């Protein structure tokens, strides 16, 4: 209607033409009415346009950026702690909750477990959650869903712990994380048959000889997963294997190397250096299940990625205004799209969660102290 009034003066001209067929005096007598009608219509048009412009500006200011209206801050965030700072009782409670998930039935496939569902979901979304802008936000949400499962299904009441591997960078295989009593068990059986990717069955600790349902596949542009029951497998790189490689991996998780990563000035430089450097060093050291997209088969995966999330959190806290909602990078795993253009990732992108939870926008998980996340690190 606005466009009709502005671009079609015939609506007004028709009245003028009708009165032109009358006497001159009649035309003169009705001119004030015509002018008044024209004035009223002009006022209406201008008022509507002005109102529309005001509404448009308000919508832009409210939704056109990612930081003008962030989620509300929570008042009492939970605190995630380093594994070795937990009491033996707290460590036992966490391990018991993880074991609980391994006995609950799957929602995806009969004969598998709820724990297996997290492995399945991680593998299915590999193109979006690795070597892409969403690498850090996706895993932050993934850890949240896992933590909620421990609480909702297994009665766990604490926060997800993390493994600060910089404390073990001089000797990763001696970390207390591998303790058979207060940890997750150690290396695979050195005398056993190789299961996958240099790994052998873990035979000590709370997850000894446990069965895992899924194996990850990577073909073409997409990641996939196949059903292939096998034992939890690890194959630590030790001095006798390759001293040069071991020294390199120890160097990648050293405090000085991690400090270099934290000094990166922007998100893309930070996440690219982090993912290919300190982050990747851990699966390359552990091998076995940990070396593939079905890495969550190993319960230590969650403590490893909680530390990854912690270091991102620390990087964000150095400049909250500039970094809390900063994201940049390819929208999908660029390694599997060679020769094809990969679009730029956006904070408005929806992250697929592999059936573990509703797909969610990246911007919803950027601030750990806001919205539904509500946690921080000690």
From Swiss-Prot:
Which residues get glycosylated?
209
Q: What happens when the gene is disrupted?
A: Abolishes the formation of phomopsin A.
Native organism: Diaporthe leptostromiformis
Listed EC numbers: 1.14.18.-
Would you tell me the protein name for this molecule? Tyrosinase-like protein phomQ1'
| Transmembrane regions | 42-62
Family per similarity comment: Belongs to the tyrosinase family.
Annotated function? Tyrosinase-like protein; part of the gene cluster that mediates the biosynthesis of the phomopsins, a group of hexapeptide mycotoxins which infects lupins and causes lupinosis disease in livestock. The pathway starts with the processing of the precursor phomA' by several endopeptidases including kexin proteases as well as the cluster-specific S41 family peptidase phomP1 and the oligopeptidase phomG' to produce 10 identical copies of the hexapeptide Tyr-Val-Ile-Pro-Ile-Asp.
Keyword annotations: Copper, Glycoprotein, Membrane, Metal-binding, Monooxygenase, Oxidoreductase, Transmembrane, Transmembrane helix
UniProt-annotated binding residues for Cu cation A: 130, 139
Does this UniProt record's set of keywords contain Transmembrane helix?
Answer: yes
Q: How does it sit in the membrane?
A: Single-pass membrane protein
Name its co-factor(s): Cu(2+)
Main subcellular localisation: membrane
Q: Name one GO cellular component term.
A: membrane
Annotated cofactor note = Binds 2 copper ions per subunit.
Cross-referenced InterPro entries: Di-copper_centre_dom_sf, Tyrosinase/Hemocyanin, Tyrosinase_Cu-bd
Pathway linked to the protein: Mycotoxin biosynthesis
